[in-house]
């Protein structure tokens, strides 16, 4: 069905659904392509803002504020399309299409033991990320749910190269409650890759984890947490590489490749060229082939 015959409400749903399906690093490209089809600037701007806000949360889009990396996620959403950064103590809107911060406002935070723990965990996690991820980003957030304090650590590393026709994203999220003696860490590691040269190949791999950590003091907890993240991500990476190798050797070879057919047909190209009698119609702008050529080629 053509978009022109859809109601405005249905058209908004279609546009939104297509935009939120854009792979990491390809949102702006998808938006520009849809603009050529829709030709409604006001509608596209509104849907681009809404879908862009969701895209940032889904893929932990990184920013840089005052020289510090900030990862956008649904954990630091304040409402009304605004995000909050603990490091700079700023809230803002982010225009993904223009790659710009807007409506920046200052916000205070309560300096307590949990905020100090957040800073310590952030330092330990940053050391791990700098050691394992070239140009990787990380962030540690605080969140209170039903009077319970949680720390949320996010890691993101992407490689977007449209010139080479592929994009890739690695992200992980780790949540634990601030408890004495023992705490449980819940994590999720997610990898997505998109290759679009000659074929359109999407790969998504994820894993959920639960581990326990002993709590002695803040420094010990931060270091133990960083070691836990390193151990689990190393295991996940090794498993993904092994699975992809097996997939490449067996499944993809059977699915994407086939044996070439054996043919014993001999084509006499010299005969075809020598019999090629063309009738030119330059004013009409086209060429037709004589019947003898077609007969000789078919025989």
From Swiss-Prot:
GO BP term (any one): actin cytoskeleton organization
Annotated positions of the Phosphoserine modification: 2, 290
PROSITE patterns (alphabetical): F_ACTIN_CAPPING_A_1 (PS00748), F_ACTIN_CAPPING_A_2 (PS00749)
The keyword Amino-acid biosynthesis belongs to this UniProt entry's keyword annotation: no
A molecular function GO annotation: actin filament binding
Keywords: Actin capping, Actin-binding, Cytoplasm, Cytoskeleton, Phosphoprotein
Subunit structure as annotated in this protein's UniProt entry: Component of the F-actin capping complex, composed of a heterodimer of an alpha and a beta subunit. Component of the WASH complex, composed of F-actin-capping protein subunit alpha (CAPZA1, CAPZA2 or CAPZA3), F-actin-capping protein subunit beta (CAPZB), WASHC1, WASHC2, WASHC3, WASHC4 and WASHC5.
Primary role: F-actin-capping proteins bind in a Ca(2+)-independent manner to the fast growing ends of actin filaments (barbed end) thereby blocking the exchange of subunits at these ends. Unlike other capping proteins (such as gelsolin and severin), these proteins do not sever actin filaments. May play a role in the morphogenesis of spermatid.
Name the UniProt record assigns to this protein: F-actin-capping protein subunit alpha-3
Species of origin: Rattus norvegicus (Rat)
Taxonomic lineage: Eukaryota, Metazoa, Chordata, Craniata, Vertebrata
Name of the encoding gene: Capza3
